[in-house]
Amino acid sequence: MYAGDDPDILYFTSTRNEAKGTDLNGITGMKSADIFHSKRNEKKQWQKPEPLASEVNSEFEEGACSFSSDGKTMYFTRCRTLPNAPAYAEIYVSQRAGAEWGAPQKCAILNDTLSSVAHPVLSPAGDYLYFVSDMPGGQGGLDLWRINITRDGFGYVDNLGPEINTSADEMFPTFSPDGTLYFSSTGHPGMGGLDIFRAITDSLTGRWRIENMQSPVNSQGDDFGMTFEPGAPNRGFFSSNRGDARGWDHIYSFEFPEVHHVLKGLVYDKEGDVL
């Protein structure tokens, strides 16, 4: 993810050796992940990633971060593993003062201590926090939810509904610079594993229309974590484990062709009937 409008610093999750945690993840068998960042130099080359030099990273697993539009507030996921307790995910927030990120605070989103909340992202207007949860009341599996942000903290929680959520898993919500919602799903028809979709509001019905991003964005592997370069609705990065026999995730770049003109009309056959 990018912080604010700076296109030359990219934040991402990694289990590389510099990550703090020493325990192995019970699902992946790899060490716990931390949040890293990489800077792009004047030659547009990405430099060696470094872990955040702050209290954001811990012995537990951190990842799936996102930022406010001014780049001064970061939301992220922390997965804690404690003795004699199930592993679960929580959302934390950290404020930046100068170049340093402050001590993170847990977001009081749910009173339910048995449900996980993860993958936070702010709406373009900053008035809602979108996230993923397995809390009761959804469509099944992991669903996309949102909670409104008020002056006093968090307000009510909404499920995004059956047009977006399925009985399988939906996760990794994000927004493009033009406000389009993107997410990954194993429930909508796709190419295999997690596929990336975008949700467009139908101007006539007000309902969501879900579109699969197709190849080459999606593959038979897991494709997720779409992020857009600030001010560029047609390029950015996403993650995928395609082509890796070990199932490890890698970061890929993308760039969509720019649409300069849209031509609409009707096509008739030789009898004058609309095709």
Task: Give, region by region, the residue ranges found by the protein language model.
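Short, conserved micro-motifs composed of acidic
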Residues: M1-L266, K270-D273
